[in-house]
Structures are given as structure tokens and as C-alpha cells.
């Protein structure tokens, strides 16, 4: 109850880097708030998935392992999060600002009538004073993101509704293992109790994925130029 939750995106049986980055940040937020960090993994063939997740300081991992949960489709994953959150009542939920996160986040937020800030670049814990009503809110999630075309940086808070939800851009948080031997609880849940048969109305027949030619996110130095460079030879240094 009232913990920090991270939705883990899974490609096959591998947790996405953006989710591991959010687990790192989620652990820090949970330490500040004095609560637990919990994670959600939903997919197919997830035996041993806790080995990837628990070292990031996860106190409880909720595992939904069943055919039809991978590849990702909207309705089953939405039902899982909405129904789980009604039970667990988290105060914060984080997910990646990816194709999946941008689809899933608004669906869950709308179903729970909670606030969602998209494409955050920074997350902090702080106090908010509602001067109009004379109310001070403690330990709110500061959801920080560029606004108005990147001309300003906005800090957004959600004082009333829970969970406070945010999607976070990949690569802006640092991925760090908290404790390689961290002992967390693994809870294996029955997806049938959270997802109805009608949620599986969409079936993925085939997927065509193009591999990235260069790992820009993992580069320590990036050299960029426009049309003025003339040719690729002019990039030689």
C-alpha cells in the first residue's frame, strides 16, 4: 500500500533498459518516502525474471506470466495495471516514455482518474503549497519536463489523485544495480483474475523489427552536424 511502482517493459524475456533506469530512480524515491519499491512484469516465459529485477532494490515483484501477454497489446496490460492498482493503491507509478508507455500510461490514468505527466526528464520529491486554499502537501512527486517547445522547464504536481503517474524518457536516468544480492519478494499472480477473455481480442500474427545500426544512447560522445558539413568525409577529425 502507498508504495512506488514501476511497470517493466519486456522484449521477449529481457527487461528494457528504460525500465531498469526507472527502477534505479524508483529505489531512490522510495528511500526518500520511506516506503517500498514494487515492480510489475507481464509477459510470456518469464521464469527467472526476478534475477533481472530484484538487484535494483525491488522489494516486491508482481509477475503475470501467461500466453498472450507478449507481444504487448493494449487491453490485457491495461486491465492488469488497473485491477492491480485498485488492490495495491500505489502512490507513484513510473513507466518508460516509449511506444508502449505512451499507449499504456494514458489508458491506466484515465481508468483510475489520476494525473499523468508524459515525457519527464527529471523526478524529485518535494512540498507543494496551495495558496488559494491554504493547504500544504508534503512528499509529492515533482514531475519535471520541457514545455512550450522546450523553451521552459515545467514542474508538475498531482496533489489529490493517486497514483501520481509519469512516463520518463529513455536514457535520462542512470541505470545502477542497488545490491546484487538484494532479497525481494516475488509474487506470481494469476492473469485470469485480472484480465478477461475479451481483452485478448487483438492477436499479433507477425512482427517485423529492424535492428538499430548504432547505439546512440550508449555512446559517450556524439558528433552531429547538418547539411553544412557537405559530406561524411568532412566529419573526419
Predicted regions and their residues:
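N-terminal glycine-rich FAD/FM-binding segment characteristic of electron-transfer flavoproteins
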Residues: 1-237
Amino acid at each position: 500500500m502507498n508504495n512506488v511502482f514501476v511497470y517493466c517493459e519486456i522484449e521477449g524475456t529481457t527487461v528494457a533498459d528504460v525500465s531498469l533506469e526507472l527502477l534505479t530512480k524508483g529505489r531512490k524515491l522510495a528511500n526518500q518516502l520511506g516506503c517500498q519499491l514494487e515492480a510489475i512484469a507481464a509477459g510470456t516465459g518469464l521464469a527467472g525474471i526476478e534475477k533481472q529485477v530484484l538487484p535494483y532494490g525491488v522489494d516486491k515483484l508482481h509477475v503475470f506470466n501467461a500466453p498472450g501477454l507478449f507481444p504487448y497489446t493494449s487491453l490485457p496490460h491495461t486491465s492488469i495495471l488497473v485491477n492491480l492498482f485498485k488492490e495495491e493503491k500505489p502512490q507513484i507509478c513510473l513507466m518508460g516514455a516509449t511506444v508502449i508507455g505512451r499507449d499504456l500510461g494514458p489508458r491506466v490514468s484515465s481508468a483510475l482518474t489520476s494525473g499523468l505527466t508524459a515525457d519527464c526528464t527529471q523526478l524529485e520529491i518535494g512540498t507543494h503549497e496551495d495558496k488559494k486554499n491554504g493547504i500544504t502537501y508534503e512528499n509529492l512527486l515533482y514531475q519535471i519536463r520541457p514545455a512550450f517547445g522546450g523553451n521552459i522547464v515545467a514542474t508538475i504536481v498531482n496533489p489529490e489523485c493517486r497514483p501520481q503517474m509519469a512516463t520518463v524518457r529513455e536514457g535520462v536516468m542512470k541505470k545502477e544495480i542497488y545490491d546484487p544480492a538484494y532479497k525481494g519478494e516475488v509474487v506470481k499472480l494469476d492473469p485470469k483474475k485480472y484480465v478477461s477473455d475479451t481483452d485478448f481480442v487483438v492477436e499479433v500474427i507477425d512482427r517485423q523489427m529492424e535492428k538499430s545500426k548504432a547505439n546512440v544512447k550508449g555512446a559517450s560522445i556524439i558528433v552531429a552536424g547538418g547539411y553544412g558539413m557537405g559530406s561524411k568525409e568532412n566529419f573526419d577529425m
